[in-house]
Amino acid sequence: MIIVVESGSTKSDWVLVNDDNEQKRFKTMGFNPFFHNETIIYNAIKYNNELCKFSKEVKAVHFYGAGCSSEELNLVVKKALAKVFINAEITVDHDLLACALATYDGSPSISCILGTGSNSCYYDGNDITENVPALGYILGDEGSGAYYGKKLLTDFLYNKLPNEIQQDFIQKFNITKADIFENTYMKPHANVYLASFMRFISDHKESEYVTNMINDGMNHFLQNHVMCYVNYKDVKVNFIGSISYIFRDNLNNQANKHNIDIGEIIKQPIDNLVNHHIKSFV
């Protein structure tokens, strides 16, 4: 029995596969070792009683997560998992590898993430190359949910939203500057808070304001995280993540302007990851 986990900063998808290739699916909060310590991760997993029923039977856990970018950070997640799945061999890898594996079709490609955060890599089937570091939601994360949420809140506080959107925002959220400051500067997980406004943004995706905002973010992402690769015009550029999927028309339009060839756009990579590991498991 194995478990494959794909975790962003907001949520984690878990798939348990038994010896007969039967699957069970679970969801937990997202785990990012930049923001979550071993205790938080362990307690969140233990809270899922249905998942933990199988903890002693699991022989391997393959975890791919946001922020799992160094041995030290990976160890935070690995220790928490080892406390739950006491008989399992545990591997922890970066979500970029999950992205690369989920979209790989046998040819080298650029793999990108547009979810709560954003990132990219070049994958040749063996090795991952990062040309530009991920700077996180304060300095970077162009085109991500946190990026757009920050833009929306900034324009709201500056009274720069179109009147219809401004009034709808006030009616739906009834929040003040103090509320926003508390959630972005004082409480943990500000990136998840910022990204939580993507549902509202999506509700107004036909408006000129949102169209321009999404297009600008996509352009910034493509310029900083795709066009940094010398051969970006010669390979497919694949995407995973809810933002790339929901706004795929905007993404394709902006990519066409730069002669970028978009390949796969996958909302959730977990199914492809499971298939990858089943092939190794059987």
Show the residue positions of the predicted features:
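Short glycine-rich, polar/acidic loop-and-turn segments at beta strand-coil junctions
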Residues: 65-69, 96, 241-243
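ATP-binding/phosphotransfer module of carbohydrate and carboxylate kinases, centering on a glycine-rich
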Residues: 1-60, 80, 103-110, 153-282
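Alpha-helical substrate-recognition element adjacent to the catalytic core
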Residues: 35-36, 64-72
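Anionic group-transfer/hydrolysis microenvironments
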Residues: 8, 15, 66, 97, ...
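Phosphate-binding/catalytic loop of phosphoryl-transfer enzymes
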Residues: 69-164
